Design a protein with these regions (language model features):
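Nucleotide-activated sugar donor-binding and catalytic core shared by glycosyltransferases
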Residues: 1-384
Length: 384
C-alpha cells in the first residue's frame, strides 16, 4: 500500500488544479501528504505564490529554489539542472512512496528525472495531450515515459499514452482537474471582486492571459504586440491581464503589459490572482483571450467564449466555445467581433467542455488508495 504521497508544484496555475486532490490526500488517515514547492512559486517576480499554499492550511515540506532572473534558453536549462539536483536531495530526505506530478512544465520534467534515478514511482496527471506550438509537448510525453501511473482527462489522451508504450492497465480516464476546481470553490460576487482587486468592470470585460509560444517562428513579444494593437480598439472594455509564465520571452511580455496598463485606464495587471479570484473573474467577464490552456480546459465550463491566439495550444481538444485566430491584429479584431456576436453566444450556451463535468480528484484519490507499490514499479513497453 502507498503511505507517503509527495505532490510537487512549480506554478500558481498548477497548484490551483492540484489543491482539491491535495486536500483529499491530507485528510486520508492512511496517507501522508508531502509537498514540494519550486519554480515560480518562490519567485518575487511571480508574487511568491507558495504563500497561497500555506494560506490554504498546507505545510510545505521542502522549498526548492531553482528560478534564474533571466528567462533565456541557457538560464532555463540551468533551472532544469537545479530542479533535478534539488528534487534528488529532497526525495532522499522525504523518502516518498509515490510522487504526483501534473502537466508539462520543465520544473516537472526535472522532478520526474530525479524520481527515475531514485526509483520512486510517479503518478502523472494530464498526460497524452497535444500542444504542438510549445516545447511543453515534448516535455509532457517525456514525463509520461518516466511515470508509472497515468491519470488522463480524455479518451484521446488515454489512447496517446498507450501509443507511447504504456500499459493500458496503468492508464486511467478521470477527466480534467480544472473542472473540479470550478465545481468546488465559492466564487466572489461582482462587487466583492471589484473591491478586492481595485478594478471597475465595464459593460464589456475581457480576461487576457498570453504566454510565449516557445516553438513559434515569430518572436513572442511580436505576437503579443499584435494582441495589444487589437485591444487598443476596445477602449470601452475592461481588460484584466494576468502574468505570463516563466518561459523564454515571458519577461518581455510582462514589461509590455506594464507599459500598456500605465497608459490605459481600462487595463489592470495582476501577478497572481489566486484560484478563487481567477475563477471569479472568468465568471464575470465576457470571455478570455490569449493562448493559455485555461481557455480550453476551464473556461468552457463557465459557458464563456475563448479566443485562442496562435499555435501554442495546437492539437489540444477544444469546445465549440473556442475561437482560433492567427497572432495578427486584424485576425484578433475579427475574433473579438465574433465573440460578441449573437450567433456565437448561442453556440457557447450549448457548448460542452470535453474535459468532463468534475470528480477527477476523487477518482484519482480512490485509485491511489488501492495502489500496490510492487505492481506499479515494474514497467515494460506495451506494443500495439
Amino acid at each position: 500500500m502507498i503511505g507517503k504521497v509527495c505532490v510537487i508544484t512549480g506554478s500558481r496555475a498548477e497548484y490551483g488544479l492540484l489543491r482539491l486532490l491535495m486536500q483529499g490526500i491530507d485528510t486520508d488517515p492512511n496517507l501522508t501528504l508531502q509537498i514540494i514547492a519550486t519554480g515560480s512559486h518562490l519567485s518575487k517576480d511571480f508574487g511568491l505564490t507558495y504563500q497561497e499554499i500555506e494560506n490554504d492550511g498546507f505545510k510545505i515540506d521542502c522549498k526548492i529554489e531553482i528560478q534564474k532572473h533571466s528567462d533565456s534558453p541557457p538560464d532555463i536549462a540551468e533551472t532544469m539542472g537545479r530542479g533535478i539536483s534539488g528534487c534528488g536531495r529532497a526525495f532522499e530526505e522525504l523518502q516518498p512512496d509515490l510522487i504526483v506530478l501534473l502537466g508539462d512544465r520543465y520544473e516537472i520534467l526535472a522532478a520526474a528525472a530525479a524520481a527515475l534515478v531514485a526509483k520512486i514511482p510517479v503518478a502523472h496527471i494530464h498526460g497524452g495531450e497535444v500542444t504542438a506550438g510549445a516545447f511543453d509537448d515534448a516535455l509532457r510525453h517525456s514525463i509520461t515515459k518516466m511515470s508509472h501511473i497515468h491519470f488522463v482527462a480524455t479518451e484521446k489522451s488515454r489512447k496517446r499514452v498507450i501509443q507511447l508504450g504504456e500499459d493500458p492497465n496503468s492508464v486511467f480516464l478521470v477527466g480534467g482537474l480544472g473542472v473540479d476546481a470550478i465545481k468546488n470553490i465559492e466564487l466572489l460576487k461582482r462587487e466583492e471582486l471589484e473591491n478586492k482587486l481595485g478594478i471597475k468592470f465595464l459593460n464589456k470585460n475581457l480576461l487576457v492571459t498570453f504566454h510565449p509560444e516557445t516553438l513559434g517562428s515569430q518572436a513572442p513579444e511580436k505576437q503579443f504586440e499584435e494582441l495589444l494593437d487589437a485591444l487598443d480598439f476596445f477602449e470601452d472594455t475592461s481588460l484584466i491581464f494576468t502574468m505570463p509564465n516563466a518561459d523564454t520571452g515571458g519577461k518581455k511580455i510582462t514589461k509590455m503589459i506594464e507599459e500598456f496598463v500605465e497608459t490605459h485606464s481600462n487595463a489592470y495587471f495582476y501577478k497572481s490572482l489566486g484560484q478563487q479570484k481567477y475563477l471569479s473573474v472568468i465568471a464575470q467577464v465576457d470571455g478570455v483571450i490569449g493562448n493559455s490552456s485555461s481557455g480550453l480546459l476551464e473556461v468552457p465550463t463557465f459557458k464563456k467564449g475563448t479566443i485562442n491566439i496562435g499555435n501554442r495550444q495546437l492539437g489540444r481538444e477544444q469546445s465549440l466555445s473556442v475561437i482560433n485566430c492567427k497572432p495578427l491584429m486584424e485576425s484578433i479584431k475579427l475574433a473579438l467581433e465574433q465573440l460578441y456576436s449573437i450567433d456565437f453566444g448561442l453556440i457557447v450556451s450549448e457548448s460542452i467542455n470535453p474535459y468532463g463535468e468534475g470528480g477527477a480528484s476523487l477518482r484519482i484519490l480512490s485509485i491511489i488508495q488501492e495502489l500496490s507499490l510492487v505492481e506499479i514499479t515494474k514497467k515494460t513497453f506495451y506494443d500495439l
